[in-house]
């Protein structure tokens, strides 16, 4: 049996006797990042000496433009968060310069501690009941035609935040009736049925939930989450709302093998997932999970070919692909084929 340490180097099981910093007491509204964030997860991450040098094909210039500044100012004005900023997405400049953004609702503090993710952890504050309306106004101001809404995990809420998603969708459609909406939802751990019942009443145009990695690496990369649960979430939504495309994605470079990626893709199709994104994992800091490999663009292209053979309606596969990158184009192609 493969141990977590064998699966991902630079990890030590928590029972290791090596002293580790005492976890900080988490107060409501305080955001923990880096070493403080991962202090209580089931594995200990040994900080890398330095971040790995990126190959030429993955380097990105972050453009500075008035449009980027305008969108950031608009987000601040309406007290909104974008996952583009919170997760340090490499495509932030391109998306913001194009006048688009992926909005992150329910605050910027997550109740999970996934050590690949750069979003802060802590005890979130109560939901902002004005957020759905503020979000709708911002989207109308930006005159967007396609919007992705995602969120932090909110394990403190009875429905995991599903009603808040539905409220946002309703307000946005009231002000921008022509907009298409994609939701990138958490796993609704322990509350799937109630969350999906709410979601089905106000469904998005695309329903997205990321598996993130292969099942062997879940304990290291997604503590508190379950691979089969996430697959079931996507399939059960599809059964409730069969006309809405479902979507999921993986990060590559955490220690998975190509064979494991192909196996996960097959499982996705068995669970009626229509759309797939595959991108390169980039280590946000020395305290996050280390990059085990940089996947070559040719390998990403091969995964895309295999995905279409399996029956995915759209496959976005490349080093800089992220779940919401060119999401409008992905959805357009997928719906044409549905």
From Swiss-Prot:
Cofactor needs: [4Fe-4S] cluster
Residues that, per the record, bind [4Fe-4S] cluster 2: 110, 114, 117
Enzyme Commission number(s) of this protein: 2.8.1.8
Family: Belongs to the radical SAM superfamily. Lipoyl synthase family.
Reaction equation(s) it catalyzes: [[Fe-S] cluster scaffold protein carrying a second [4Fe-4S](2+) cluster] + N(6)-octanoyl-L-lysyl-[protein] + 2 oxidized [2Fe-2S]-[ferredoxin] + 2 S-adenosyl-L-methionine + 4 H(+) = [[Fe-S] cluster scaffold protein] + N(6)-[(R)-dihydrolipoyl]-L-lysyl-[protein] + 4 Fe(3+) + 2 hydrogen sulfide + 2 5'-deoxyadenosine + 2 L-methionine + 2 reduced [2Fe-2S]-[ferredoxin]
Metabolic or biological pathway: Protein modification; protein lipoylation via endogenous pathway; protein N(6)-(lipoyl)lysine from octanoyl-[acyl-carrier-protein]: step 2/2
KW Cytoplasm (keyword) present: yes
Segments of this protein annotated with the region Disordered: 1-24
Pfam families noted in UniProt: LIAS_N, Radical_SAM
Entry binding sites for [4Fe-4S] cluster 1: 84, 89, 95, 324
Protein's name according to its UniProt entry: Lipoyl synthase
Signal sequence segment: none
Species of origin: Pseudomonas putida (strain ATCC 47054 / DSM 6125 / CFBP 8728 / NCIMB 11950 / KT2440)
Keywords: 4Fe-4S, Cytoplasm, Iron, Iron-sulfur, Metal-binding, S-adenosyl-L-methionine, Transferase
Cellular component per GO, a single term: cytoplasm
Gene3D superfamilies xref list: Aldolase class I
InterPro entries registered for this protein in UniProt: Aldolase_TIM, Elp3/MiaA/NifB-like_rSAM, LIAS_N, Lipoyl_synth, rSAM
Domain Radical SAM core: 96-313
Keyword Electron transport in record: no
One function term, GO molecular function aspect: lipoate synthase activity
Cofactor note: Binds 2 [4Fe-4S] clusters per subunit. One cluster is coordinated with 3 cysteines and an exchangeable S-adenosyl-L-methionine.
Protein's cellular compartments: Cytoplasm
Predominant cellular place of this UniProt entry's protein: cytoplasm
């Amino acid at each position: 049996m493969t141990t977590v340490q064998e699966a991902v180097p630079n990890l030590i099981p928590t029972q290791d006797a090596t002293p580790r910093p005492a976890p900080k007491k988490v107060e409501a509204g305080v955001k923990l990042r880096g070493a403080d964030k991962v202090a209580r997860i089931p594995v200990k991450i040994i900080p890398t000496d330095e971040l790995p040098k990126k190959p030429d094909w993955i380097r990105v210039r972050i453009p500075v433009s008035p449009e980027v500044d305008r969108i950031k100012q608009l987000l601040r004005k309406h007290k909104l968060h974008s996952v583009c900023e919170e997760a340090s997405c490499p495509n932030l400049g391109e998306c913001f310069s194009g006048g688009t953004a992926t909005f992150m609702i329910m605050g910027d503090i997550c109740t999970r501690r996934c050590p690949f993710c750069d979003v802060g952890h802590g005890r979130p504050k109560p939901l902002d009941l004005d957020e759905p309306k503020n979000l709708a106004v911002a989207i109308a101001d930006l005159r967007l035609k396609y919007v992705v809404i995602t969120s932090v995990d909110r394990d403190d809420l009875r429905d995991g935040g599903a009603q808040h998603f539905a409220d946002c969708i309703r307000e946005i459609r009231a002000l921008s009736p022509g907009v298409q909406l994609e939701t990138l939802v958490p796993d609704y751990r322990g509350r799937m049925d109630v969350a999906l019942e709410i979601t089905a009443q106000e469904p998005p145009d695309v329903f997205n939930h990321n598996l993130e990695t292969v099942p062997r690496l879940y304990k290291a990369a997604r503590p508190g989450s379950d691979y089969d649960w996430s697959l079931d979430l996507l399939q059960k939504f599809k059964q409730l709302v069969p006309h809405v495309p479902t979507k999921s994605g993986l990060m590559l470079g955490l220690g998975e093998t190509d064979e494991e990626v192909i196996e996960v893709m097959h499982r996705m199709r068995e669970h009626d997932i229509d759309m797939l994104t595959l991108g390169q994992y980039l280590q946000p800091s020395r305290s996050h999970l280390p990059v085990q490999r940089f996947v070559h663009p040719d390998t990403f292209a091969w995964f895309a070919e295999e995905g279409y053979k399996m029956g995915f309606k759209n496959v976005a596969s490349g080093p800089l692909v992220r779940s919401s990158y060119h999401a409008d184009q992905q959805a357009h192609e997928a719906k044409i084929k549905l």
